């Protein structure tokens, strides 16, 4: 599992290369929850996925073409929330 740097910001975009793939994530607020858009090698694979602690961001392995996945880790399994990013909530990449 590899830590992915996120900011304490309500809306942000991250682009990282992991395992030879270019991942682009957009994390944004939607009312009282966080949602994630994911692109793999410039191809959109997910839009508006609700961020849930301890669960894969990409809910179906086939969407990521057998590549890795992302997971929010939070204290007490609280729902991810931007004000807690870098305090007691983080984003991680898990290799397939």
Residue ranges and their predicted role:
Residues 5-7, 27, 61-63, 83-84:
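Short, exposed beta-strand/loop patches in secreted or surface proteins that constitute
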Residues 21, 32-34, 89:
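Beta-strand-connecting loop/turn residues
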């Amino acid at each position: 599992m590899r830590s992915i740097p996120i900011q304490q910001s309500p809306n942000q975009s991250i682009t990282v290369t992991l395992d030879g793939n270019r991942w682009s994530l957009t994390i944004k607020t939607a009312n009282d929850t966080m949602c994630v858009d994911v692109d793999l090698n410039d191809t959109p694979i997910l839009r508006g996925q609700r961020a849930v602690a301890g669960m894969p961001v990409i809910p179906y392995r086939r969407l990521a073409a057998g590549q890795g996945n992302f997971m929010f880790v939070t204290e007490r399994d609280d729902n991810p929330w931007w004000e807690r990013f870098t305090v007691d909530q983080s984003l991680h990449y898990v290799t397939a």
